[in-house]
Curated annotation (Swiss-Prot):
Its EC number is 2.6.1.9. Keywords: Amino-acid biosynthesis, Aminotransferase, Histidine biosynthesis, Pyridoxal phosphate, Transferase. It catalyses: L-histidinol phosphate + 2-oxoglutarate = 3-(imidazol-4-yl)-2-oxopropyl phosphate + L-glutamate. GO terms for molecular function: histidinol-phosphate transaminase activity; pyridoxal phosphate binding. It comes from Roseiflexus sp. (strain RS-1). This is Histidinol-phosphate aminotransferase. The modification N6-(pyridoxal phosphate)lysine is found at K229.
């Protein structure tokens, strides 16, 4: 046995700052001394209404009528799911790749694109997984900060691409954690740059806008989507990406063959078959977003940023200490929201939009705290 096992591991990983995920619900409930059913979870942008009834019925049908499906490997080509997605987004199946959540697709695209020493542009504040994955592959991450209103600095990005020779740019649209939309005209300008532009549309259904129709004509455009938010399937880890078929051929080569499990595929297809119910749920969340935004803006010391997603970012007068105090105070009452201990957001909290009664409980608690 070697004297030091760490000597056989990648030394750069030792210095890598790990990504901080949401603490599991059961762990938080135990830590707070509360039963799980007492917790109001507004910290991870999940769908408060859960999966489609059609999806739940489809899963129950597999368990009842075809349990053997769980004992055999899933379809490595996701033929039925890609056909359903083709009808949903209007792109042919050969432009669609499925994965275990959009997180896997972010990783796959970086694996297909970035070599050690290559450069990726990041536009903070944004989803931290972009810079984390890029660092994992030994890429240089060049930040181009967003404006005070969290818009993308298009000219700054163009200058950075030319100056740094960057290959890849990830942009969430709407952005997480700010909820800021991305104009189609800005996407068109960015597509003129000599980079691969990955648009992460995890919250597109809540925004009502998309650029997925552009992938056929734009070989350097990749659009990522997920079933975690609008479809309420975060626990099953299912997402997909649409891209030009030339790029898809590269990504397909490095995709693990059985990366989407049977349950996830069954639930995703059933959700796509139940679009009327799912879109009605999305509409309810959007309506609640606007009601909640107005109520939060009326609280003393709250600045609420406009959002096109299923969450709201609030800047708190009094700085980081006050924002953290509010977050902790809500947690003691069994209400979980997100505090970001990072530059530019350390005086902010992010609140996922819940059901009306959950939002009312949140507002009642906030009025006590502020």
């Amino acid at each position: 046995m070697p004297a030091s096992i760490t000597g056989l591991l990648r030394p750069d990983i030792a210095a890598l700052e790990p990504y901080t995920p949401i603490v599991p619900l059961e762990t938080l409930a135990e830590r707070l001394g509360l039963p799980v059913e007492r917790i109001i979870k507004l910290d991870a942008n999940e769908n408060p209404y859960g999966p489609s009834p059609h999806a739940l019925a489809a899963l129950a049908a597999v368990e009842r009528d075809a349990p053997h499906r769980y004992a055999i490997y899933p379809d490595p080509d996701h033929v039925r799911l890609r056909a359903a997605l083709s009808r949903y987004i209007g792109q042919p199946p050969e432009r669609i790749i499925c994965g275990a959540g959009s997180d896997e697709l972010i990783d796959l695209l970086m694996r297909a694109t970035l070599r050690p020493g290559d450069t990726m542009i990041d536009c903070p504040p944004t989803f931290a997984m972009y810079s984390f994955d890029a660092a994992l592959y030994g890429a240089r991450v060049v930040p181009v900060p967003r404006t005070d209103q969290f818009d993308v600095d298009i000219e700054g990005v163009a200058e950075a691409v030319e100056r740094e020779g960057a290959k890849l740019l990830f942009l969430a649209a709407p952005n997480n954690p700010t909820g800021t939309p991305l104009a189609r005209s800005d996407v068109e300008r960015l597509l003129d740059l000599p980079i691969i532009l990955a648009i992460d549309e995890a919250y597109a259904e809540f925004a009502g806008t998309s650029v997925v129709d552009m992938v056929g004509a734009c070989p350097n455009l990749v659009v990522l989507r997920t079933f975690s938010k609008w479809a309420g399937l975060a626990g099953l880890r299912i997402g997909y990406a649409a891209m030009h078929e030339d790029v898809a051929a590269y990504v397909w080569k490095i995709k693990q063959p059985y990366n989407v499990n049977v349950a996830a595929e069954v639930a995703a297809i059933a959700s796509l078959d139940d679009l009327e119910e799912r879109m009605a749920t999305v509409a309810r969340i959007v309506a609640e977003r606007e009601r909640l935004a107005a109520a939060l803006a009326a609280l003393p010391g709250f600045r609420v940023y406009p959002s096109a997603a299923n969450f709201l970012l609030c800047r708190i007068t009094g700085g980081a200490a006050r924002a953290r105090t509010i977050c902790d105070g809500l947690a003691q009452r069994g209400i979980l929201i997100r505090y970001f201990n990072r530059p530019g957001l350390d005086d902010c909290i992010r609140i996922s939009v819940g059901r009306p009664e959950q939002n009312d409980a949140l507002l009642h608690a906030l009025r006590e705290l502020v």
